[in-house]
Structure formats: C-alpha cells, structure tokens
C-alpha cells in the first residue's frame, strides 16, 4: 500500500501507551510526529487516557493529505468506460448511479448503493482488480445510515462535536481482499460525499466498517483530510529476524 492511516494511528498509540504503562503519572503528549519512508506524519490525541474497569485510550487523529476526485484524475474517462462495461456485464446498472474515483495515496472506487452486504463486496471486489488501468484498486460499497442519540453522545464525548452524518461501508483492498477497515478508504469515502455536496466537510462524518468506526473531517478543501479513530492492543509477540 502507498499509505496506511490505520497503521500510522496504531504506531502512534503504541508509542503513547508504552511509557504510560511503565509510569501512569507520565505526561501524555498532545501530538507525536512519525518519520515515514517518503514523508512525515503528525498524530494528535483527542482526549485523555481514562482509567476504570477498562482503560479508555484517546482517539488518534492523523492528517491524511488531500484527495483527487473523479476528473481530477487523469484517467477518469478511461475508468468511467471500464466501470460502465463492468456494470453492463453484471447487469447492475445501479453501479453507475453514484460512484466515485478517488486518489489519496492509494486509489479507490466507491459505489453508493441502496443495499450493501459482505457478499456483494466479495462479488465486486475481485472483478475490478483486473484492468490495464492499474495493478489493483481498493473497492468500497457504501450507504447512508441513521445517526442515533447514542452515536451523537459517543462522538461528542470523543471529538467535542456530535456527528450528524454516518455511512456504512464494506471494503475490498488491493492485494489483500476483503478487510475489516481501511483508513485511506474511509477518508476517500468522506471525500466523495463532500464532493457530491451531501454534507458539510467541516463537520466530523462517521464511517462504520466491519472493524469499527472512523471519524473524518476536512475544515476546508485546501486543508488535509483528518482521520480520527481508536487503536487497541490485539496481541504482543516477538519476531526473530
């Protein structure tokens, strides 16, 4: 992958928690700067570490850069023809009603549909991989989702601002297949929604994926897209190289 927002977030959270585990009184930084292979990433922490029955970590917010949407991509006309052919071959004209091509480090095809499911992404994902346009592409199917009072409370507590827009998504990642979550994908989904004029980009937007929820915002079109979400320890281990 060209970029991995989830990986950046997890790396920053690991850096945050290790000194805290050794000494809970250690001062927690507001930001951590990470040096990547081709760039640098700054991660902000939204909130504080809260102790209780289970330790609650703050959300980690990462600047993900700016997206190129549809005609901002040089090959948009060719991709449009390719998508039209696939829609015809599958007898799925609904694919053409609301779709976007987004580049944000990685490339993404996003289809907004009335009905989505894991079975559908397993059907569509592999089909879009084979093309002379790319060596694979991330594919997402999305739909709008009702925001509950609980969603508003949780987001207000975590972000200082309640969300008013929420989308559900399933993901097929280039070279990996169906995955639980995709950080650059969630940002690209939000970018496609803003470009369509469906919501205010300066407000946090929620994207629900099988692996959990991410929050996305972009104060203005000239700013970086910011992705915020949790990171939790899955396991520890050692690798001998």
Go through each PLM region and give its residues.
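Active-site proximal loop and beta-alpha junction motif in alpha/beta enzyme cores
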Residues: 1-3, 8-181, 188-241
